[in-house]
């Protein structure tokens, strides 16, 4: 594995990295390089920690060991790793939603019939996958290392898991569809950053306290990433909340369910005050203490951040407000297809490079592009770099009023996106449309679960990160050939991950091969 030469495709990120370096920290890139060389067995799913007899590994070249201690071979071990990664992603999303609002625990998953094209729903019914219910999470069949016929059986349950995950996203959409941000950015205010998943009642109380501030210095409240709650301002963190620490943060509230363990020690190292909070603590006390810490830190900090915090800048026109226009543009050939990008930067590749390459290729081909996930938080940075790369073609394309680029800022918007695309489908299945959902960069199991959800709904899904499931040729064949038979979903990826330009050509070719319904 080569060391990292280019950390990000965003030029404005460089001063932040240098500022961190000057303060003695190489951030996630330095920690990644300390792990090199990475374990090739793990990278291909050829190791197993399921029991305490191991951990076991499989030699992919025919030499020993060819089986684990229990006797499982490469196909069974890799399928088990795939199953566990998917299940973990579904549970991660479920726990996140539950931690925000415990009342959602008692809600059953909504019916998915209205979200599926008729033929897709019929096929899933014939396979016994629909309807899906929460309780099925505990009944899905993983391989259990039983026998090889379970490869196909487990793929059926991966599809079921994908639909259950989508059901959770529908619950999220319904619960927070009426919630909107009402806070204004105070340029001279102190910046307080929340990391993790406080409850909705705590977030609502925090928002009220920020809104009710009067006189003197005020506090800006920021919520990390796109966690489905559009009630706070978001800012461009350049792909990692670690960079946020170099941008002028004054205090952090960190909850136990945060996904970023590095933030605590980095904040302590850089003398940024942190407050470790529990979910059920009195929020007024936490807020008062956090506000005081932030304001005091702002008074005494001596350094000037190389890139000060400001709200994320993105087009104000939603793709959902343009249904009729998009439909007519597709019919008239003004728009040649649709690319949906969802994902989060991965340290193994230059942040946003693959994302930008796909965006530029699609926009140059007059395709509609919708970007979601953590990439959407950095919409302003992406637009600026796209404008530089595209030159004279950029103005009309990136224009918020009539351009082909838009952003989705919440995981809870995925069901609305699916409904939007179904309306455009004219009765066809999603994989028959000039449409690709791409994950050029992904990190967490929950992001992989989103990809499985789109596959389970019958979309063509492209993945631009090396997946740890390619140690089994038999499983690779099942994933690539059998998924279309179950849901219609098409997985556009391969054991040998192509470069960004090759993957962009693959995306364009797939979309161009699907005709627009006149």
What are these regions (language model features)?
Residues 1-422, 429-449, 457-518:
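Metallocofactor- and cofactor-centric catalytic cores in central/energy metabolism, strongly enriched
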């Amino acid at each position: 594995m080569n060391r990292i030469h280019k950390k990000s495709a965003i030029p404005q990120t460089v001063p932040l990295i240098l500022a961190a370096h000057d303060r003695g920290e190489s951030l996630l890139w330095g920690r990644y390089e300390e792990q090199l060389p990475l374990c090739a067995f793990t990278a291909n799913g050829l190791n197993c920690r399921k029991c305490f007899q191991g951990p076991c590994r499989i030699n992919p070249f025919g030499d020993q060991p060819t089986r684990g201690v229990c006797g499982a071979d490469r196909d069974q071990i890799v399928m088990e790793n795939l199953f566990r990664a998917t299940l973990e992603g579904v549970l991660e999303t479920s726990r996140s939603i539950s931690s925000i609002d415990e009342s959602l625990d008692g809600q059953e998953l909504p019916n998915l019939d209205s979200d599926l094209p008729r033929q897709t729903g019929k096929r899933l019914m014939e396979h016994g996958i629909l309807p899906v219910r929460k309780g099925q999470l505990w009944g899905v069949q993983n391989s259990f290392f039983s026998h090889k016929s379970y490869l196909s059986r487990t793929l059926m349950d991966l599809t079921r898991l994908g639909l259950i995950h989508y059901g959770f996203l529908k619950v999220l959409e319904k619960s927070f569809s009426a919630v909107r941000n009402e806070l204004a950015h105070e340029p001279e205010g102190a910046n307080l950053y929340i990391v993790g998943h406080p409850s909705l009642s705590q977030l609502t109380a925090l928002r009220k306290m920020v809104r009710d501030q009067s006189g003197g210095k005020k506090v800006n409240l920021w919520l990390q990433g796109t966690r489905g709650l559009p009630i706070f301002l978001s800012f461009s963190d350049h792909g990692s909340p670690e960079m946020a620490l170099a941008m002028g943060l004054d205090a952090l509230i960190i909850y136990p369910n945060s996904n970023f363990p590095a933030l605590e020690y980095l904040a302590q190292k850089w003398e940024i005050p942190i407050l470790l909070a529990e979910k059920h603590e009195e929020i007024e006390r936490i807020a008062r203490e956090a506000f005081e810490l932030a304001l005091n830190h702002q008074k005494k900090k001596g350094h000037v951040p190389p890139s000060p915090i400001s709200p994320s800048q993105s087009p104000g026109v939603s793709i959902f407000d343009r249904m009729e226009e998009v439909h007519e543009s597709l019919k008239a050939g003004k728009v040649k297809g649709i690319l949906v990008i969802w994902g989060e930067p991965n340290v193994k590749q230059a942040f946003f490079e693959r994302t930008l390459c796909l965006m530029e290729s699609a926009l140059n081909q007059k395709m509609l592009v919708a970007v979601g996930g953590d990439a959407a938080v950095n919409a302003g940075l992406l637009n600026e770099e796209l404008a530089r790369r595209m030159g004279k073609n950029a103005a009309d394309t990136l224009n918020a009023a009539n351009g082909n680029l838009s952003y989705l800022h919440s995981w809870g918007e995925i069901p609305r996106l699916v409904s939007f695309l179904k309306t455009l489908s004219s009765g066809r299945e999603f994989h028959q449309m000039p449409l690709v959902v791409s994950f050029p960069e992904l990190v967490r199991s929950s992001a992989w679960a989103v990809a499985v959800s789109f596959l389970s709904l019958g979309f063509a899904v492209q993945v631009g990160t090396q997946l740890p499931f390619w140690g089994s040729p038999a499983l690779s064949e099942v994933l690539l050939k059998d998924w279309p038979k179950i849901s219609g979903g098409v997985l556009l990826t391969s054991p040998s991950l192509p470069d960004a330009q090759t993957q962009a050509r693959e995306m364009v070719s797939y979309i161009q091969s699907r005709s627009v319904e006149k």
